[in-house]
Amino acid sequence: MNDQSPLVRIEGVSKHFGDTVALDNLTLDIASGEFVTFLGPSGCGKSTTLRILGGFERPTTGRVILDGEDVTFQPPEKRNVNMVFQDYALFPHMTVAQNISFGLELKGMSKADIRKCLDEIMTFLELDGFGARYPGQLSGGQRQRVALARALAPDPALLLLDEPLGALDAKLRGQVQQELKSIQRRTHKTFFFVTHDQEEALTMSDRIVVMNKGRVEQDGTPEELYFHPATRFVAEFIGETNLLSGEMRGQDGDTVMMDWFGQTLSGHAPGGVPKVGDTITASVRLEKLSFHSARPDVANAVQGTVVGKTFLGSRMAVDVMVADAKGAKLRAFVDAETGLSIGSDPTWIGWDSDSMAVLRD
């Protein structure tokens, strides 16, 4: 494959199940060595995409190119692709070593080569000493590593991961997230990860593709999607945000001015906006708002009164009733020890224009 060509190319892929459109003309490239996550709610098309990449489903239209070869109609066993399932799908009657060796035996490797590969992958994934154990004797994190070892041992070009952390408790899930990303970086493998969990996507991914109703809502880095969502769906699905709607007043390059309850606010709109006079909506993340005793020297500033606080450990969520805004509220994250009291004197809240993303819809 040419180094400049994508490892995976999805070209105009649609998938229909009767009258239901699971995927609607999806076109996407994935570079070699990327950790790409498909993120979205149930029924958005992310798992259907994974199954098409793995050869478990055939697209209704379009094609899939893997490493320069059209694999659209190739069965799973003919593709240089492997998969880690949500329940890991380890064979309970086989030892760890036998589970990991299973795919190597199917490839027809010699016993000596299997032994060498097994030793290397078990050392790499810190499974030395576990070879004779059975899956039922392992912790959740250990089973995760065995499933990864089995999937990586045959050296696939693409590894598909179907919500593999869903069965883990919150603490272990956080540990495995870091471990999984570390493994991907060290192996330089291309990971295609499917999840509905925004934290998993933000923590591990080089790139996130947000899906909605079979289509791509937005495709970008975790930082781009979080701080500069393109649509209302992305803004609300990833993290918590303040949504402000008002009339568009004007535009200066990528900066858009809007009227919000009689105050002029400015936001960032790199993707273009409707015409002057139209109603637009903007997103401001909670951590981008700051509190001040006097009007701050920033692009956007409003006055309000603290009406609620929620303790979240190291930080606190503060609700502010904005003055002269017909009951509109803003929510902000502050340090947990910040001395803001409910019903205290009015305070100023400020944020810059780059922190306010004007949405397409």
Question: Over which residues does each language-model region extend?
Answer:
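Helix-to-loop junction immediately C-terminal to a conserved catalytic motif
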Residues: G54
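Conserved ABC transporter NBD signature motif
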Residues: G62-D70
